[in-house]
Design a protein with these regions (language model features):
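C-terminal subdomain of alpha/beta-hydrolase-fold enzymes, centered on the catalytic histidine
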Residues: 1-144
Length: 144
C-alpha cells in the first residue's frame, strides 16, 4: 500500500483535474495531446477514456472512437486534444486477465509508425494545435 500511494502521487492522471485551472500557485494550467491506440494492452482504452474525461479534453472528429461524455470537435484544435487510432487488432480478453503482450504491444507500438499519427503528434508538439489528418477516420492496418 505504501508503494502504491507513492506511485499515485507521481501518476500524471493525478494532475488532470487541474489541467484547465491549475492549483493555487503550485501548478499552472497546462495542455496535452492524448494519442491512443485501440486494443492497447499497455495503456488501455479505459485509461485513456478516464484521462480525457477527467481532464475535460476534447476528441478530434476524425478519431476512430469517441468516448462517452467527451466533446467531439472538428479540427484544428488549439490546446488540449485527443485522438484514438484503430489498427483493427483483436479484442483484449475480458475479466481480470491479460492477453499475450507480444500481440497487444503491437497496438501500443505500431501507431507510432502511422503517418497521420506522426503528423498529429509532431505538429502538436511544435505548435500546440492538433490538425485532424485522418480522412475520414483515424484507422490503419495493423501488422500482427
Amino acid at each position: 500500500a505504501l508503494l502504491q500511494s507513492i506511485w499515485d502521487s507521481t501518476d500524471g492522471e493525478t494532475y488532470l483535474p487541474f489541467r484547465e485551472t491549475g492549483y493555487d500557485d503550485v501548478l499552472e494550467p497546462f495542455d496535452m495531446f492524448y494519442l491512443t491506440s485501440m486494443m492497447d494492452a499497455q495503456v488501455t482504452t479505459l485509461s485513456a477514456d478516464r484521462a480525457v474525461r477527467t481532464g475535460n479534453v476534447p476528441v478530434v472528429n476524425g478519431s476512430a472512437y469517441h468516448p462517452f461524455g467527451v466533446d467531439v470537435v472538428e479540427g484544428p484544435i488549439e490546446g488540449s486534444s485527443a485522438a484514438y487510432f484503430d489498427g483493427d487488432f483483436p479484442p483484449l480478453p475480458t475479466g481480470n486477465t491479460n492477453g499475450p503482450m507480444w500481440h497487444h504491444s503491437l497496438a501500443h507500438n505500431l501507431v507510432l509508425e502511422v503517418p497521420e499519427a506522426k503528423m498529429m503528434a509532431y505538429g502538436y508538439l511544435l505548435s500546440g494545435v492538433l490538425v485532424d489528418y485522418c480522412d475520414p477516420k483515424c484507422t490503419f492496418e495493423g501488422d500482427w
